[in-house]
Amino acid sequence: MAWRVPGVRPASTFFPQVLRASSELPNRLPEGSTVGPKPDSSWEAGSQGNWGLTSSGAGQDSSAQKLGILSVQISLKIWTWEKPSGWGHLHAAVTGASCCSPLSQGGAICLVTAPQDKPDCSPCTSGH
C-alpha cells in the first residue's frame, strides 16, 4: 500500500536552485519533504545522475504508516533530467517503487512498504 508523505511542498521550497546533474544536491532532505514530478514521456532525458539521499529522524520503524510521525530512515534515489530551458524534473524511488504527482499539483513521493508493493497514487505509469 502506498502512503503519501504529509506536508506536501513544491520541490523548489527545499532545493535552493533548479536541479541539474551536479554534485550540489543536499545530502539530507528536511523531514516531511517531497519531490516531483516524474519525467513526462515527451521529455528528453539529457544530463542525468542519481544520488542516495536520506531523511532520518527519531524512529527506526520501517512501517509506512509511521513515517509521518517518526520520520524514520528513508533511502531515496533521485534522478534529474534537464530540458534546454534548464528546468529539471525529478523522480524519487523509495524501497523500489514509487510514483509522483505533477509538480503543479504539489508534487509528492508515494511511499511503499516493500519493493513488491505497487504504487496506487495517480498519475503513475509502469516501468519503474
Curated annotation (Swiss-Prot):
<protein>
    <recommendedName>
        <fullName>Uncharacterized protein encoded by LINC01561</fullName>
    </recommendedName>
</protein>
<feature type="region of interest" description="Disordered">
    <location>
        <begin position="25"/>
        <end position="61"/>
    </location>
</feature>
<feature type="compositionally biased region" description="Polar residues">
    <location>
        <begin position="44"/>
        <end position="61"/>
    </location>
</feature>
